[in-house]
């Protein structure tokens, strides 16, 4: 490629793009770690995007109506960091660029949400960014429908690489976006034909443009190093009536004489000698991390070009009726709906009196019927299991082309994209997403669920059919290890409610959470209401509490969750009949219990006596409460699952696997 000809054709563009490239090269070299090739290859596309098309104001990084820019190919993080520094984001200082990938740095190896303003989402696991962006596009459409396009009218731009498009989640996401006709979503494909193993063709022959077209997208192409051709394609993309893929043909490591267009430049520093040659090829005579003042000033002018449009937008916002403005600002700031607590309180009181015997998945539906009318920002959904997850209430309609006021997503059999899209909805602002599937299929959503926890995104995962209690569908659908997996994930609340009251309390906590996602593990089988005396306080917020106290001298404590709390209470009755004083502790959320002060934990689980945990899942998460926290191994037992389940009616399964009142009582007596 003739670099001199490109430099001569668009000299102003060349200087701006070269500033990105050299910052990326220098930061990776200084860190002795990173990925310079992608920023070098996509600098031209990014320059045209930020200079001519992206709506943003670097001095107001959280402006509600800004365009969102998602770097799905997160390994190329220095592309984003260089842009944020050059355009004048306050937190993106040159010192931070120099501190790339170091302890305490805002500029982490892969972009991390919450570390640096301008980073819209955490990326790095390939395919997550493009899928999260689909959720952002859905949220934009929802907010525009509710508040009007004078307040909400922006695009979601994504840079994705070959690896993003190979990941299975990408097909789920592009299929969902195509079905929803999300014309506010534009994906810029860094088509450099290189992976770590070599040419893309060593592992893939997919016609990506045909794949996107078949999924309902418009497809455009450009020379990713020709500023005028890039501008033409991006201008056309903004006018499309469907989501757009722009095929940007690029060279990875553009300008490196010996490493461009090879995997050698993907994930390692260029080295001093190659950097010298590359600078010469660019015509860049400045030292490491030196950006001439006139180039920095031009970039900062680009960063300020949205200020006037933002001021006009703020005037429109200020002119709204006070109530509408306050509600818009609350939803964008992700504030808790003011009527939520009252709705939950009234629901609990009514259900304590009615004492229904319902599955907790049905209880969840009942809670949502009370909550959705007073929390207008909820958008629910299911991965093709609406009738089983019971996630749709009668007051909400489907979100679809032509009805963006709808608050229910038909995700199809796309668990992973559903989870990522929900992350994107919350990150955009204005939406509280929840979505359902069978608990066993958290396996299909795991990558995005982990990012919920890592980012501090309070997505609500409605996971029904939570144990062998689902019955005849058998071990392929019966979760036994999944509670342990969710509980092992940092910054996750895993709720397994025992009845309709605990279900309501779990929902209140999930919809009030600021920075922690929630998993609601809900039963298929009917469970009785255990708390028939109304308690205004949210007992689930403590994580665990005494649901039945020992009569006489306490000799044993039974700990249980979900459907097994009822079984534990029946075991208590057997033990009490033999004068064995037994306390039953319901533990709907281990994480919240662990967060309580030691005095409370000691009050619920005092030292001495036998402890038995009961749960139709594996033992692994329970040893903290059985062996630790004042427990003793010789006095500790577990009644639950040791392996996978089986296909049979639920009642038979509980009997065959020994999760019965009689087995629990026998376990206690064997430990006395």
From Swiss-Prot:
Record function comment: Catalyzes the transfer of a two-carbon ketol group from a ketose donor to an aldose acceptor, via a covalent intermediate with the cofactor thiamine pyrophosphate.
EC annotation from Swiss-Prot or TrEMBL: 2.2.1.1
Upper lineage: Bacteria, Pseudomonadati, Pseudomonadota, Alphaproteobacteria, Rhodobacterales
Important for catalytic activity (site feature) positions: 35, 266
Annotated SUPFAM superfamilies: Thiamin diphosphate-binding fold (THDP-binding), TK C-terminal domain-like
Cofactor: Mg(2+); Ca(2+); Mn(2+); Co(2+)
Residues the entry annotates as binding thiamine diphosphate: 75, 124-126, 163, 192, 266, 441
Key words of the record: Calcium, Magnesium, Metal-binding, Thiamine pyrophosphate, Transferase
Gene source species: Rhodobacter capsulatus (strain ATCC BAA-309 / NBRC 16581 / SB1003)
Binding-site positions, substrate: 35, 266, 361, 388, 465, 473, 524
Amino-acid positions noted as binding Mg(2+) in the UniProt annotation, renumbered to this chain: 162, 192, 194
UniProt cross-references to SMART domains, sorted A to Z: Transket_pyr (SM00861)
Highest taxon of the lineage: Bacteria
Keyword Calcium carried by entry: yes
Gene Ontology molecular-function annotations: metal ion binding; transketolase activity
The protein's name: Transketolase
Record note on quaternary structure: Homodimer.
Cofactor detail note: Binds 1 Mg(2+) ion per subunit. Can also utilize other divalent metal cations, such as Ca(2+), Mn(2+) and Co(2+). Binds 1 thiamine pyrophosphate per subunit.
List of catalytic residues: 415
